[in-house]
Amino acid sequence: MALLDDDDISTALALLPGWGIEDGMLVKEYVFPEGFMAAIAFVDRVAVAAEDADHHPDIDIRWNRVRIAVVTHDEGGITGKDTGLAAECDRLAVA
């Protein structure tokens, strides 16, 4: 899959509220007011989606906060795989 250029990334970010770029990766922090178990349930849903897509994000869990970072390592940057997984994470956060 081809790397996205800066314009493509800006367009994608406009459709992905709360996502940003950090160290060349798409990054977002989700907060679950319900607490730790809600955060873990979200991570479980993301894990299934990531495995199905064969595209695995970096995940950091801090009690009720989950930080997701995605990048296509094989391509050396952000691709459509990353924006697709970011959108899926947003969908799963409200599931």
Predicted ranges, named:
Residues R67-L92:
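C-terminal structural segments of small proteins and small subunits
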